[in-house]
Amino acid sequence: MVSENDLKYDRLLTSVQAKKYRVMIVDDEQDITTIFKMGLENNQFIVTTFNDPVEAFSEFRPGLYDLLILDIRMPGMNGFQLYRKIRNVDNKVKVCFLTAFDESRGEFRTSFPFLEEVKCYLKKPITVRDLVRRLVDLANS
């Protein structure tokens, strides 16, 4: 028997297939970007990955991506710094922050008040299914 959650997920995938969301993933851990890329591409997302935030910014072009997944803690430039630089050139792209650390969303908002505009905050580990749900919700927000 198919559960209501499975039916909702199937409807989500139908909307993703129709839209073909373009996603940039930036995480210094190559295993994470590889797993997310494979999982999202299997669900009809168009995915570009970077393991270096400086390189990601240099390759970023306004309008090229619908959604960004940015790891918070990376060497060279953290996810918040990358987000601010990207927002200076494209204020329409939607972002989802990602972290493996225990800081709560509230702790980050205290340090980074601009996070009020951020609608998506994910903690590793996360399943591909949950990632897809959150990204579709973000895209439709």
Please annotate each region the language model reported.
Residues 49-67:
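Acidic, metal-coordinating helix/loop segments flanking the phosphotransfer/catalytic sites
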Residues 81, 102-122, 129, 133:
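Alpha4 helix (beta4-alpha4-beta5 surface) of REC/receiver domains from two-component response regulators
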Residues 1-22, 127-141:
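Non-catalytic signal-transmission and effector/linker regions of two-component phosphorelay proteins
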Residues 58, 80-91:
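Short amphipathic alpha-helix used as the core "switch/output" element in two-component signaling
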Residues 51-52, 78-82:
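Acidic catalytic/metal-coordinating carboxylates
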Residues 27, 71, 99:
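Active-site residues of response regulator receiver
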Residues 30-48, 138:
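Two-component/phosphorelay signaling modules centered on CheY-like receiver
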Residues 74:
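Receiver (REC) domain active-site loop signature in two-component systems and cognate sites
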